Amino acid sequence: SLSTKDKETVKAFWSKVSGKSADIGNDALSRMLVVYPQTKTYFSHWKELTPGSAPVRKHGMTVMKGVGDAVSKIEDLTAGLMELSELHAFTLRVDPANFKILSHNILVVFAIMFPNDFTPDVHVSMDKFLAALGRALSEKYR
């Protein structure tokens, strides 16, 4: 679970990086689709799945808006993200294992884009936060 220090660290880091969330989302989703090609099955309805394409950029931004929303609901992610959990479980039918894959790619992009701010302590807190976010999104799968 997230400690008070983790929550403070996540909020502080997010305030530094959120202005670049479109770029973060685009790069993280682009990487996921290339490095983990099995994830493309969820996006087969898109005309183009290449890194940086319009649909990838758009969904990357959507994902990062969700991350930003989760930061604002960090005190109760499960209740705060119930609608998103239902969407992913019942409508989109996304395998929850993919939340871990995307979280990993988001962390990679943080490290690349913010090498001075993404310290080991920030890395730990963001990793714990993204894992908690994934668990909250998986809530309706039970």
From Swiss-Prot:
User: N-acetylserine modification sites?
Assistant: S1
Which residues hold O2? H59
Disulphide bond pairs = none
Biological process terms in GO annotation:
hydrogen peroxide catabolic process
Domain of life of the native organism: Eukaryota
A single GO molecular-function term is:
oxygen carrier activity
Q: Which residues bind heme b?
A: H88
Question: Per the record's keyword annotation, is RNA-binding included, yes or no?
Answer: no
GO cellular component terms given for this protein: blood microparticle; haptoglobin-hemoglobin complex; hemoglobin complex
The family database entries (Gene3D superfamilies) matched by this protein are listed as: Globins
Q: What else is known?
A: This fish has two hemoglobins: Hb1 (major) and Hb2 (about 15-20% of the total). They display the Root effect and the alkaline Bohr effect, which is enhanced by organophosphate and to a lesser extent by chloride.
Family affiliation: Belongs to the globin family.
Q: Provide the protein name.
A: Hemoglobin subunit alpha-2
What is the species listed in this Swiss-Prot or TrEMBL entry? Gobionotothen gibberifrons (Humped rockcod)
